[in-house]
Amino acid sequence: MSFCLTELYLWSLKNNLHIGDEDVGVHQYHEKKEAALHPDYGFLEEKQQWMESRGFPWILKNKRPEKLRDNLTELEELMQSSECVLSKWKNKYVCQLLFGSGVLVSISLSGPQLEKVVIDRSLVGKLISNPISDAIFTDSFIILSFLKENKLCLIQFTKKINSPDINRQLDKLSLLDLKISYTDIPGPKGRHLVRHLAINSMQDLALCWWPVPVDDVKPWSPVSSEKDRANLVLLSNSSCKLEVLSYIRTEGDLLNACFSINQPYQICTVEHSLNSNKEPMADRFIYECVRNKIQCVSVTRVPLRSRVISCAVNTSEDKLVLGCEDSSLILYESDCKVTLLAQADLLPDLIRWHPNGTIFVVASSQGELQIFDMALSPIRAQILAEEIEPNSTIQVCKQFNVSSTLVEMHWAAPHTLLQNMDMTDIYNLLYLRFDGGPIGVLQLKLGAICRGQLGAMEIISQYIRHDEVDEAVGLLSSMNWNTMGHQCFTSMTAIVNHLLRQRLTPDREAQLEASLGTFYSPTRPLLDTIVLQYRDPISRYARRFFHHLLRYQRFEKAFLLAVDIGARDLFMDIHYLALDKGELALAKVARKKAEEIDAESINSGVEPLLPTDTLADVNEAFVDLSLIPQVEDRILGSFPSTDLGAHNSIQRNANRQLVHIENEIGIEVYAESLDKSLPWNQECFEEDFAEENPEGIGSLKVVHFGLV
């Protein structure tokens, strides 16, 4: 059973969290002589020694000029007295927190541990309106929105810091010579609205949006206007000022709005609406900025069973996850128009995709977490403990005493670099913020085998390692060959090799078909370059599957696969094996099919795949297949009985997932390439046959294309 091991690091000095001394996977900072304050905890000293032996501080130092312990205490007091409106990762080592009062806190990390905390009050008292609703931080400016005012504030830095030194990036704003300006925006006046902000990757367009209030002014009201009813505002950021370009009123209730990562002048929104039958829907709108106007380009409507409360889009923007009030999760794949449904074990208040787009985390406001892969298969996890007890959810709230709700969750990765992210870098920290504190990170312990990565290949390898083949095949089916060709091929070969090493059962047969079907019968059309690059090596795995079927006398499925491959030698293999087993009708049909392929080759001027002499040698090499051990006969009895002549068309269509491959994608089979010993298959073949025939008695030799 595969599962993910985690550790929870809370950046807190409070002694009322009541973290147990036996909870080896939950950590916080402590005061000196704290053991005397908790006489019931008899293992605090041992836990301290264990933490310090791993290089993690138990007691924070308070040396000047950092004064880390004092600054952390001040940060915790600030979280109690003021609302944190934004948590943004400048890079994977620096997190910035902005409070409604204008206080900016920068946190520098070393792994999951605090290294430096800088509290900046440069903006306090310099803004005309409080409190702050949302903010955008860049290296050259800041944009602020407010709860009580229809205004946006632009703060420009006349001095820039381009130093890669993290300590220089934590300098206070007062050193950057701030220039502050304001811009009025449309929207209802005199309303307290949480106005959200977004900016495109070019940083020349900004977006301000807010959900429609419950008691909103009706469209037929004489006091309302289009400007007052707007809830989506597009602004330009040029010439050192913000300027309103366009504004609209969305059709549904806005759940999220942002600029596309890949298309900087496209706006993507997710809206909640009702259809004509008053049933809930989730609408995904794509808007474009054309001549400084917002124009709708496309609309995708996803029917739901209950109201949507959260959503998230992956970095490649082809998968949208929706969380609903009934704890259901809907995954919509835009490129192949497929919708998947799963049931979460918690209320999905927050959803966050991992930067590489393979997994996402769902969280409830009570502090429960659940991990899913992009095929909606749940990944079990647990916080480090003495006993191995993985569960479907991580109960963070039960690890310490906290009465507040989980309000924010992010991966420790900068949003601006997601489109150019280095996939070899490690992103294993999940930032958690509870209302009023504490804050901290959940670290995923991925181990040396996965190299700290959370990619599709690493997760599939873990699935295979624990014999969870259905989950591995499901994840492979969700991968895109056109953009992840190497990962798809590596994952597919790993699954197929794993299955071919084992005895054939109905489940494994279906898994082999599904794995090869991701290439031969894809849900989305494959690019010609992908087909040309991978068709030859994958056709060899299809041949191995054919002989695996033949080995277990799955004549019908082997015949259908031979039709798809279109090779004469495969039909001759069926012919001689059927003769040996007394299946004269099948032998006759297979021989006839081989002769048809021969005739087509002669008419088209193409030489047969194998010379006649070679075929004669192969035929003489066959031995009596009655020597196969009786245990395999018992396995064959578990398969449904098939009759090639009486097989109905419905069953044939259901079983043929690899139909007309040669006609559809132009696969050509060359005997000279297949006769060669393949370096990546030779080991697998030797291991397979050594495993199945340890004594070498009463079994067959490898005489032709892996046939036993």
Swiss-Prot record:
InterPro entries associated with the record: Frtz, WD40_repeat_dom_sf
Protein's cellular compartments: Cell membrane; Cytoplasm, Cytoskeleton, Cilium axoneme; Cytoplasm, Cytoskeleton, Cilium basal body
WD repeats: 303-342, 343-382
Membrane keyword on record: yes
GO cellular component, one term: axoneme
Sorted UniProt keywords: Cell membrane, Cell projection, Cilium, Cilium biogenesis/degradation, Cytoplasm, Cytoskeleton, Membrane, Repeat, WD repeat
Gene Ontology biological process terms from the UniProt entry: cilium assembly; cilium organization; establishment of protein localization; mediolateral intercalation; nervous system development; regulation of embryonic cell shape; regulation of protein localization; septin cytoskeleton organization
Top-level lineage group: Eukaryota
A Pfam family the protein falls into: Frtz
Signal peptide residues on this chain, from the entry's feature table: none
The keyword RNA-binding is assigned to this record: no
Family: Belongs to the WD repeat fritz family.
Subunit structure: Interacts with sept2-a. Interacts with intu and fuz; fuz, intu and wdpcp probably form the core CPLANE (ciliogenesis and planar polarity effectors) complex.
Cited function: Probable effector of the planar cell polarity signaling pathway which regulates the septin cytoskeleton in both ciliogenesis and collective cell movements including covergent extension during gastrulation. Controls cell shape but not polarization during convergent extension. Proposed to function as core component of the CPLANE (ciliogenesis and planar polarity effectors) complex involved in the recruitment of peripheral IFT-A proteins to basal bodies.
Protein name, as recorded: WD repeat-containing and planar cell polarity effector protein fritz homolog
Species name: Xenopus laevis
